[in-house]
Amino acid sequence: VTRTAREVVELYNLVVWNQRNFELADELMGDNVIRHEVGEATTLTHEQAVARIVDHWEMFNTIRFDLNLVVAGDDGEHVAIVYQSPMELKDGTRTDVGSMEIFRVVDGRITEVWNCGYKQGVWE
């Protein structure tokens, strides 16, 4: 059974990231993942997309993604999130960042992510 785009994005944030489930990351990431930013796009192979998650986790003692808002598009492929992310770095520094991302999910796998960056602080 193929998961809905919303289910994939929620699993990616709440299970892959929040529970360090890298096996699920392997299942949810596409053959290639295009990460869009303003002015540039980076295409990651499947292996690079999974390694990016593992490598990011190595910088933190804890990191959590709280999804303040999840909006699934009518096309069945796009999902937008507003998130808050409390984290603790390896040196014990604690901080919060917030941002928005839009995901494209095809056949149950994340194939594209749009992110214009994050900002330190908490959503008001």
Question: What is the role of each PLM region?
Answer:
Residues 1-124:
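C-terminal and inter-domain tail/linker signature
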